């Protein structure tokens, strides 16, 4: 018979994790083994002569024996540092309750609770001994029915299986969070207390357990002792390595009961379940924002404190979260650990890799509950959802501008600092973001990895590919609340919004002119510098922007992909189609504030505005004459070059500008009877 009030070994043992055990030298490990052998002999004797009245006497003997381990290590000169850590374990950590059945079956100890101890496992690993000369110890007869992981204790396998089923029996009284085991609940309660005997010398954080302290310390030291045999990637603790290994094997043992989706780890499953329940148990005390995971909550807190504990070893730059420092470090190493099995493409980031995979499989599993729009990755969905709520949690301290994603915020910060950390190895040009560098790189290679499934057209830029796809779907998800106008891109939507607010955040230092979007500002800057970085390979003509080069390219190919549905007329660019559409509708949305005159396009309004201001920013390099619009400068330039590109089909006469050809054409019409 099994004693109902028996004391299992794990109730009284001071156990070592793999990390803690690694700190001990061989003599200290032998000392631990000798003391723990004595402990087992005590347990065995209790098993033979078990009497309820002797429980507490024997329990005190066990406690005394276990404490000797710490004391002897502390006295050892060699183990002084490690002994100091061990003797920090407070007395109350050993005073665990003696009630409740916590025994496991063992062919050696019979009715006595077996020693399910991390220490014993590490003694076997490091010394090669069978645990305390008992051959049967170390067997793991209990296997998880979901993932087949072996355990040497029935209660352990039952606790583990709850991670798969999602059953959580232990509830935190303070915040209502639930856990699969009592030990996990106890560890969680410490978060509410905010105390612990192990204080980090780097950041002052106090931790309750030595194992947690050692793992936490690695976030500062950068130590990563667990390495993946397949790809060489290293991790700070073994559980992270196990989860990572599943990305190679494809194993996803944790399944959602509600939608059937499977995950690599139980934490991912629990975080996913909250997308069904809407639960966000972690609330920020400063701003009230709630989070579904403690990790996201901790990173958010740093936006208030300004703490950046993760530092790049190469350049010293600090970051709020480990994923950001890893992403940054790849800019130094150019490492791309994620390889696509479909096309062989290698990517630097897991999110980019997941997005890329979705393009091959067509799987778009993350759907917006408000508008039904689907996304390849959860991060893209989260960013999109903020367009509905209007939430912009990332605020620039310099100009006050707010953003709905941290990446947009980081990119914006560089407009103030001028930082361009991503440099092209071929031409030396620098960029503010890795994605811009990647897109630029394709101008050298000619690579166009994004192909439209409907018409087969390839693109070098993913955002251009998305814009093009919306042209087929006629999708315009971004709507102006004031006028009801819809847009296919958030950038176009935000640019339009500024026409209402009058917000112009980008000012030219040379002429004082301000712009409401960074691309217009950059394009304008080239009118001063004369820079034209985009050159046509067919005729050598250069342009200030990639879009201009693309539109020009169609004059060679004759391609006109934008067709008017009303009259069938086709155009080489979307803007020209849009402008043409207004000839049917009569719409003139751009109004001059000085005289009230309206125009069908922004550029016409801009040129008209110069008739009021007298501004003539386009200057002829040969004679110094200035003009209000670029077309007039081009026309004037032909008086110097003698170029006459407009030819009459009837008589062959040539002209400098299209208007002269049109006037001449009318003369033929009059002559015709």
Curated annotation (Swiss-Prot):
GO terms for cellular component: nucleus. Its main location: nucleus. Residues 7-85 form the KRAB domain. GO terms for molecular function: DNA-binding transcription factor activity, RNA polymerase II-specific; RNA polymerase II transcription regulatory region sequence-specific DNA binding; zinc ion binding. Keywords: DNA-binding, Metal-binding, Nucleus, Repeat, Transcription, Transcription regulation, Zinc, Zinc-finger. A zinc finger (C2H2-type) spans 142-164, 170-192, 198-220, 226-248, 254-276, 282-304, 310-332, 338-360, 366-388, 394-416, 422-444, 450-472, 478-500, 506-528, 534-556, 562-584, 590-612, 618-640, 646-668. It is found in: Nucleus. It comes from the Eukaryota. Pfam families: KRAB, zf-C2H2, zf-H2C2_2. May be involved in transcriptional regulation. Belongs to the krueppel C2H2-type zinc-finger protein family. This is Zinc finger protein 433. It comes from Homo sapiens (Human).
